[in-house]
């Protein structure tokens, strides 16, 4: 039997994990084993909301060392993280300033300023990326305006996964799928857009040309002295999750469910027309030149904050209690900027419930309208797919079949690119066949008589009436 041992480092906004994958070539079987899991979270430092990158690096090294201590030969390593955030380095590779998190308020108001000065349509047609107030474009503008004293010391700007790969290998890389989340990459050239960089105040010399997934960045030398390749995987965690989504057919959509939830479909071409702009659709880079056409949804962030504030540890019990309650009594818009990082999430939700205006949730409809074809099934992947209540609500609200799983989608997609780089698999579609036969998948059938299905139908009926009367 021929085996490959690949290690995936998967960092999320609330936790990180080092996972060992064992791939058996002859039977095309893939098994995962968790080596090390650790917490991640926001910290307050010198008036900024930051990440503790030193702690994360220590946890990564601890996990890698554990694998080596077991005497396992590692064939490759890959790292994926969340998007938009970055670390600045000087000429000697030492950090400049703080690793500020996207939930910090430093970039507030700068998105509107960019739209006014550059033109909203022009920014969108250049980047194809949705407008979010914490995109790297605005974070860099905040940095260069508010901390100009740092600029003479900056030689490099590395996005989070590239920074940790650099710490392991000493080699710098700017991976394409994650680079596109910055709103700084030109959608036509796949290189940094000079006009957008100029507005941000950043120097183009801080960045190298983005590279597509599948190249070896460098090597990590393990304690035993072996040189292990570190692969540039699809380093944006959602890009990795989409690779592991067992999409079947052109009418399949995906929902990567975690702290953030991202709903969309794959396309060979981007969508940057006025309809896409009006719906704030994003065209993030994917593997093999594909685009991840999607919408950002606030996801489980609100739930995570409520659990923390109320000190609730038994999530299954809470879900069971919630399932017994009537649906749609209180509706809020979780994508409202007020929920990005409020001081007290519970109080903010209560305040929103007191307001009367209710938004119409229609991410699936906007995506379907963009394609000109309805979806027939929705693949929910990531940690959030373990929430059976949420899965059923999605099926009922969208009116289509939901297939939940795999849970560790980002990890699996990370491993998939490594196996392709090692010439064990041909392409993404080949890897998805492996996922389909090895992952635990659960199907949820929509219930048209559910309360939420009736509520969504009523909302759409109300909207159509308003459009007729306008």
From Swiss-Prot:
Pathway field: Carbohydrate degradation; L-rhamnose degradation; glycerone phosphate from L-rhamnose: step 2/3
Organism domain of life: Bacteria
Single Gene Ontology MF annotation: glycerol kinase activity
Active site residues of this protein: 237 (proton acceptor)
Cofactors that this protein relies on: Mg(2+)
Cysteines joined through disulfide linkages: 68-222, 394-398
Biological process according to GO: glycerol metabolic process; rhamnose catabolic process
Sites where the protein binds substrate: 83, 236-238, 296
Cross-referenced InterPro entries: ATPase_NBD, FGGY_C, FGGY_N, Rhamnulokinase
Pfam families linked to this entry: FGGY_C (PF02782), FGGY_N (PF00370)
Database matches in SUPFAM superfamilies: Actin-like ATPase domain
Enzyme class, first EC level, given as a word: transferase
Chain positions recorded as ATP binding sites: 13-17, 259, 304, 383
Family designation: Belongs to the rhamnulokinase family.
Protein name: Rhamnulokinase
Species whose genome carries this gene: Shigella boydii serotype 4 (strain Sb227)
Gene (name only): rhaB
């Amino acid at each position: 039997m021929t085996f490959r041992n690949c290690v995936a480092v998967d960092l999320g906004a609330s936790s990180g994990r080092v996972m060992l994958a064992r791939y058996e070539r002859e039977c095309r079987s893939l098994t995962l084993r968790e080596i090390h899991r650790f917490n991640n979270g926001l910290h307050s430092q010198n008036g900024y909301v930051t990440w503790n990158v030193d702690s994360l690096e220590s946890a990564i090294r601890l996990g890698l060392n554990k694998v080596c201590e077991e005497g396992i030969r590692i064939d490759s390593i890959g790292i994926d993280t969340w998007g938009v955030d970055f670390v600045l380095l000087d000429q000697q590779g030492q950090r400049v300033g703080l690793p500020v998190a996207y939930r910090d308020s430093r970039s507030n108001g700068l998105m509107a300023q960019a739209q006014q000065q550059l033109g909203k349509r022009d920014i969108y047609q250049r980047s194809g990326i949705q407008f979010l107030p914490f995109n790297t474009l605005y974070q860099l503008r905040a940095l260069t305006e508010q901390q100009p004293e740092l600029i003479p010391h900056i030689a490099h700007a590395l996005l989070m996964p590239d920074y940790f790969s650099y710490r392991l290998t000493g080699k710098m890389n700017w991976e394409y799928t994650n680079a596109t989340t910055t709103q700084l990459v030109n959608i036509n050239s796949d290189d940094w857009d000079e006009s957008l960089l100029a507005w941000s105040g950043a120097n183009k010399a801080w960045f190298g040309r983005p590279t597509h997934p599948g190249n070896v960045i460098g090597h990590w030398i393990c304690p035993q002295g072996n040189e292990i390749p570190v692969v540039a995987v699809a380093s944006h965690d959602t890009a990795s999750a989409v690779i592991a989504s067992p999409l079947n057919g052109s009418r399949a959509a995906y929902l990567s469910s975690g702290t953030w939830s991202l709903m969309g479909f794959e396309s060979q071409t981007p969508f940057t027309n006025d309809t896409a702009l009006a719906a704030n659709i994003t065209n993030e880079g994917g593997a093999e030149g594909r685009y991840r056409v999607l919408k950002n949804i606030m996801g489980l962030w609100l739930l995570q904050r409520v659990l923390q504030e109320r000190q609730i540890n038994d999530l299954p019990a809470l879900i069971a209690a919630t399932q017994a309650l009537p649906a749609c009594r209180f509706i809020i818009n979780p994508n409202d900027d007020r929920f990005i990082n409020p001081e007290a999430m519970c109080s903010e939700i209560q305040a929103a419930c007191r307001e009367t205006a209710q938004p119409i949730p229609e991410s699936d409809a906007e995506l379907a309208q963009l394609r000109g074809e309805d979806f027939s099934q929705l693949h929910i992947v990531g940690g959030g797919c373990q929430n059976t209540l949420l899965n059923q609500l999605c099926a009922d609200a969208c009116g289509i079949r939901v297939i939940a799983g795999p849970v560790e989608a980002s990890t699996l997609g990370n491993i998939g690119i490594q196996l392709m780089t090692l010439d064990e698999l041909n392409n993404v579609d080949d890897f998805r066949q492996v996922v389909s036969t090895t992952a635990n998948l659960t199907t949820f059938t929509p219930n048209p008589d559910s309360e939420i299905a009736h509520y969504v139908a009523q909302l759409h009926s109300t909207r159509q009436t308003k459009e007729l009367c306008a």
